[in-house]
A protein has these predicted regions:
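Alpha-helical bundle regulatory/interaction domains
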Residues: 2-35, 39, 43, 89-236, ...
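Conserved short histidine dyad/triad with adjacent acidic residue
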Residues: 41-48, 56-73
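Short histidine-centered beta-strand/loop micro-motifs
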Residues: 62, 68-74, 92-94, 113-116
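Short acidic (Asp/Glu) patches
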Residues: 62-67, 83-88, 106-109
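Short, conserved beta-strand element in jelly-roll/cupin
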Residues: 72-88, 124
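Short hydrophobic/aromatic patch on the recognition helix
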Residues: 256-260, 308-309, 313
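Alpha-helical DNA-recognition elements
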Residues: 262-263, 315-316, 327
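Cytosolic nucleotide-binding catalytic cores of signal-transduction proteins
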Residues: 271
Length: 331
């Protein structure tokens, strides 16, 4: 049988490879020194998609054959490995990975895995110290992040994991069908924000945590809400991520969450998303449709999945974003 040539694409921030030889993926994987050993017949082609963001790196792989994987994680970066499909068993570092569990790999730690069939996985690695300082600290979460240490973790909210898988699938689809969109920094920042949101939700439903600061009573939570509103007003012309808000107020994620749930009945992530919709609507009403597009404004406010943006926008305001844009010229 004639060998099938691998298909490879790279434009700097996005890399895509599809091949029949599973071990060929190893040379393209980032932030790990990895060896892949095939242990069964090839069922489908294998593939790897990589997207480099500012604070994190996303790698999505599909192994089209049973394999053994031996790897050493980058000495400067840590990360999370998730397995998406559950139709074949996978063992990582002696732990069976099921629908609610995933692996954390510290800097320079060992990854030893065996999979007995097809495997689709996600690896999210963080720039040096970002996980500890910008995710775990606001969450008040306890995780052993020492070098050479790995941990088997269990998430208590399947919906949080499913949200990650959905977002990663959408990003991967863009990488396959429209890779030039990754040259738009507003779009890539929006994608990164979505990935960070999923990590916040997953870790908050996985790790034991303690409040960074202790606030008791309605007065303290009222103060947090007032400070949040003041901060958002002072930065009204730029999108704010929930981690930025935690940092600005010097409060933990759990404290912020309880305050927003008490006063608004929604999480701070949802609140900030609604604020971004309101800002996008403001810009649509003010914009000249001859010079500005809906996608330009959506991307500015970190909405990168334009189909979802249109549907959710219409659900909020009873009209499509394009109708708002054209209506603005009539006012």
């Amino acid at each position: 049988m004639k060998a099938v040539e691998p298909r490879f694409f790279s434009n700097g921030s996005v890399t895509r490879l599809e091949t029949r030889d599973i071990d060929e993926l190893a040379q393209y994987m980032k932030h790990a020194d990895i060896e892949l050993i095939q242990i069964g017949r090839t069922i489908t082609p294998s593939s790897l998609t990589q997207v480099s963001f500012d604070k994190i790196n996303l790698q999505v792989g599909h192994y089209g054959a049973p394999y053994i994987s031996n790897a050493t994680i980058d000495k400067d970066r840590s990360g999370m490995v998730y397995k998406v499909n559950k139709d074949f068993p996978t063992t990582c570092n002696g732990y069976e990975i099921d629908s609610a569990s995933f692996m954390y790999y510290g800097k320079n730690s060992e990854h030893i895995a065996i999979n007995n069939g097809l495997c689709r996985w996600i690896y999210i690695s963080f720039k040096p110290d970002y996980l500890e300082e910008s995710l775990l600290d606001p969450l008040g979460a306890k995780l052993d992040t020492r070098r050479n240490v790995s941990s088997h973790l269990r998430c208590q909210a399947q919906a949080s994991l499913d949200s990650l898988y959905e977002i990663v699938n959408e990003i991967t689809e863009f990488a396959n069908s429209n890779p030039l969109i990754f040259h738009n920094t507003d779009v890539t920042k929006g994608m990164e924000w979505s990935l960070l949101d999923t990590q916040v939700l997953i870790l908050s439903n996985t790790l034991n945590s303690s409040p960074k600061n202790t606030y008791r009573g309605k007065k303290s939570r009222e103060s947090i809400i007032r400070q949040s509103i003041d901060f958002l007003k002072a930065n009204s012309y730029e999108p704010i991520h929930v981690l930025d808000l935690c940092s600005a107020l010097n409060v933990g994620m759990r404290t912020l969450y309880y305050a927003f749930r008490e006063f608004f009945g929604i999480s701070p992530i949802t609140y900030l998303r609604l604020v971004r919709y309101a800002k996008a609507r403001r810009d649509l009403l003010k914009a000249d449709p001859a010079r500005t597009s809906v996608t330009d404004i959506a991307a500015k406010w970190r909405f990168w999945h334009f189909g979802r943006f249109s549907v959710e926008y219409k659900g909020l305001y009873g009209e499509s974003p394009s109708e708002t844009l054209n209506k603005g010229m009539e006012i």
